[in-house]
A protein has these predicted regions:
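Contiguous interface-forming segments/domains that mediate binding rather than catalysis
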Residues: 1-156
Length: 156
């Protein structure tokens, strides 16, 4: 699968993001340049939630889910489920992400982690029907990163 396909899944409208797929001279971006452009665009457009590995400040993940629900006109979790997630105590952020995914999967969605090679998780919501496509493409080409951290992650 090409990165353009992954971009289309993450951002849902490939026409919207075509400008980030090339440089100012019209040359297609590749490798780490492309993944960096995707990250920057995703953050600027609110498609990615940037969370420190140390954990959330406040209710960042819950607010992100609620914003996604509002902008897409869908319900991914009940108010009760969101409140339980908000009150959850955890030592590792991936533990909370796993709990979020247990809830979102009921609606056919998941919370995925875009690789960064930094001290932050870049999270995004996508349909589970696209899970295999999202997980198969190497996103970051950095030999210093463990192999699994070069791919989009889905924690269960």
């Amino acid at each position: 699968m090409a990165m353009e396909d992954i971009v289309g899944i993450i951002f849902e409208d490939i026409e919207e993001v075509k400008p980030i797929l090339s440089d100012s001279e019209g040359n297609d971006l590749e490798g780490n340049d492309l993944s960096e452009a995707i990250l920057e665009y995703g953050i600027s457009e609110g498609k990615f939630l940037c969370v420190d590995y140390g954990g959330e400040e406040g209710s960042e993940i819950i607010n992100y889910i609620m914003d996604y629900e509002f902008s897409h006109g869908i319900e991914l979790a009940t108010q009760e489920e969101l409140e339980e997630l908000d009150e959850m105590e955890y030592d590792d952020l991936t533990d909370k992400i796993k709990e979020v995914n247990k809830i979102l999967e009921k609606a056919g969605y998941g919370l995925f982690c875009f690789p960064t090679g930094s001290d932050f998780y870049e999270l995004f919501i996508a349909k589970l029907e696209d899970k295999e496509k999202l997980l198969e493409e190497k996103i970051v080409d950095d030999e210093e990163l463990p192999l699994e951290e070069r791919y989009i992650q889905y924690y269960v």
